Amino acid sequence: MLTSGLLLVAAVAFLSVLVLMSVWKQRKLSGKLPPGPTPLPFVGNFLQLNTEQMYNSLMKISQRYGPVFTIYLGSRRIVVLCGQETVKEALVDQAEEFSGRGEQATFDWLFKGYGIAFSSGERAKQLRRFSITTLRDFGVGKRGIEERIQEEAGFLIDSFRKTNGAFIDPTFYLSRTVSNVISSIVFGDRFDYEDKEFLSLLRMMLGSLQFTATSMGQVYEMFSSVMKHLPGPQQQAFKELQGLEDFITKKVEHNQRTLDPNSPRDFIDSFLIRMLEEKKNPNTEFYMKNLVLTTLNLFFAGTETVSTTLRYGFLLLMKYPDIEAKVHEEIDRVIGRNRQPKYEDRMKMPYTEAVIHEIQRFADLIPMGLARRVTKDTKFRDFLLPKGTEVFPMLGSVLKDPKFFSNPKDFNPKHFLDDKGQFKKSDAFVPFSIGKRYCFGEGLARMELFLFLTNIMQNFHFKSTQEPQDIDVSPRLVGFVTIPPTYTMSFLSR
């Protein structure tokens, strides 16, 4: 009895010492780090956060501690940046210091710092430079890719016509269309819309992405070192990510067997050729793992961002039929019904441009941004961020900054129109992030959004199962990404 009592006292004393050491360490750092709520050992600020509304939880904390504060997600120390001025100051004015990539635990299970999106330093720079050049070689930013988008838009319109006005969920209609554009670049060909393997890939992408937006996905961000070994929905996300990697690996192996170094067919071929050229370079970043995971980065990002934005956009246009009618009027006046829209038409279509920008602003697809990491001890305002500190640039707080948008919670294309009805840019329009690590697919995404939306709206009216006033446009999930509500709609020929 005495022995067990002594053991209990010893255990309590040991835990007390650990707690005191943790608090002391955190307080020691707080003289350099921005202020924030006091964390508990091991769990950090978990008890102060609503994992179902992580973005809103962090913004609520910023009301107390200001636009720069420190939060602990479990043992992860994060500096959170809110508002246009703060985010720009970090990502643009101190771009190099904030250019490291922070953690995204779900995707890090697979990527582990390889590929283009989740890497840092020289690897990220080399892969980014190569990817930008290679995408340009295959027509991105040129007439060639515009023709590819227009061709795919034609296939999409045909598939909508075949629904004969029935109510459908547009999710996979959109994702397979958008995915075929990036597929033609990275794989050299498009998929048939009914290809079962293709549809399986799209489900894997959507499933793994949706997990990151769930409450459990946010809990996993805090306790991944333990949860990756436990049963739960994270295991399904891992299975989906593994399935995507396996598919890309199979594609790469096929290209290896049929490669002509003098005639690259696609992004994979170009990377394989670069691997051959750098075979004797001991410091090369061009090897199989980076090829597979960079290709997956491009395939994933090139599919989900634009298709999810369009899906949210359709819902918003059904909610606000007067806005839909104005877009129809501008399309009829500038383009007419007898030719396909061209990307250059946007210069004469300020209202449509404003609507597309407002859809992106309202959708706010990556509200907390991709996490950054400071590359060295960094002085930021009155604080000192130790090398390796993770940073959340809250892109949603920029897209909803009341200094730039009069009614940031409302969907209103006037946010991007001047007094004369002409399109106006905004320094707070950052859906593709800003600075050195902005999304280099921005140009392609802008072209896709304009051409797909105008092609579809040139041919169809949108009809909801609900009256406009009853449509709820609140997101279904908000975590690492924003997931719009699930709905069905009808495409009625004009």
Curated annotation (Swiss-Prot):
Stored CDD domains: CYP2A (cd20668)
GO terms for MF: heme binding; iron ion binding; oxidoreductase activity, acting on paired donors, with incorporation or reduction of molecular oxygen, reduced flavin or flavoprotein as one donor, and incorporation of one atom of oxygen
EC number(s) per entry: 1.14.14.1
Membrane association type: Peripheral membrane protein
Tissue-by-tissue expression: Kidney and lung. Expressed in liver, with a strong circadian rhythmicity. Circadian expression is regulated by DBP.
Chain positions with N6-acetyllysine modification: 379
Annotated positions of the Phosphoserine modification: 131
Residues annotated to bind heme: 439
Other facts: There are only 11 differences between the sequence of testosterone 15-alpha-hydroxylase and that of coumarin 7-hydroxylase. By site-directed mutagenesis it has been shown that modification of position 209 is sufficient to convert the specificity of the two forms of the enzyme.
Name under which the protein is recorded: Cytochrome P450 2A4
Organism per entry: Mus musculus (Mouse)
